[in-house]
Amino acid sequence: MTDLKTIIEEAYQNKDNFTTDTVPKKIHQAIHQTIELLDNGELRIAEKQNGQWNTNEWAKMAILLYFKTEPLKTFDAGYTFFYDKIPLKYTNNTSQPQSGVRVVPHAIVRKGAYLAPNTVLMPSYINIGAYVDSGTLIDTWATVGSCAQIGKNVHLSGGAGIGGVLEPLQAHPTIIEDDCFIGARSEIVEGVMVEKGSVISMGVFVGQSTPIYNRQTQEITYGRIPAGSVVIPGSLPSKDGHYNRYSAIIVKQVDKKTRSKVSLNELLREG
């Protein structure tokens, strides 16, 4: 994989020197090999190592090069046609899902996204570079953006949106760690991280500029929901006191044992 990384990095530095029609064969093959590695889960856009998430920038480069070098093509979906550069993940009988993966009709998964065993997709959208780990449910009309990393046993409720982050290359993707619940119509975007075991209420919107207020510590932070947080939508007064600003409010923090005994609705009501 080291050779592949070197080819992709060099190609990205010289990307203005070739087009769809003139891309060298060696680069074309390296791009497709990288997309295939992302597609089957052997490579991830981001990985957690020694407790820290690290981004594989070169894998992002490969996706951007894929967009640049692939021609527009017509894709036959049986009942309609699509016109795009990137094919769907399951295009024929030879590209079967892994064991236990369920893809309900009208769910869309692009090539280069990975679905681990025992994931369930209701009619939803999974973009290129995304990684969805085992036991996760992506509910109806939920979206998982490019390069987003979704952990094990996560529930993305109806209409929830997990934002994609392709550029800048060094930026972390949006990350939802294991055992999280993301409420209906909530949006987690711009590389925000929701740590393990957190519960996000319905209609919570969190980007990098959204204040995250911890009711217990009275601290305001940005870009990260700590492990075990129970989060609801709220607001904080402005510095001049003339208006309120939307905020995400951490009303409490719970451990796995508490979550197993108490329903999600009870946790949120107690806030």
Curated annotation (Swiss-Prot):
It comes from the Bacteria. Pathway: Amino-acid biosynthesis; L-lysine biosynthesis via DAP pathway; LL-2,6-diaminopimelate from (S)-tetrahydrodipicolinate (succinylase route): step 1/3. One of its GO terms (cellular component) is cytoplasm. Substrate binds at residues 102, 139. InterPro entries: DapD_Trfase_Hexpep_rpt_fam, Hexapep, THP_succinylTrfase_dom1, THP_succinylTrfase_N_sf, Trans_hexapeptide_repeat, Trimer_LpxA-like_sf. It is found in: Cytoplasm. Its EC number is 2.3.1.117. SUPFAM superfamilies: Trimeric LpxA-like enzymes. Gene3D superfamilies: Hexapeptide repeat proteins, Tetrahydrodipicolinate-N-succinyltransferase, N-terminal domain. Belongs to the transferase hexapeptide repeat family. This is 2,3,4,5-tetrahydropyridine-2,6-dicarboxylate N-succinyltransferase. It comes from Coxiella burnetii (strain RSA 493 / Nine Mile phase I). The gene is dapD.
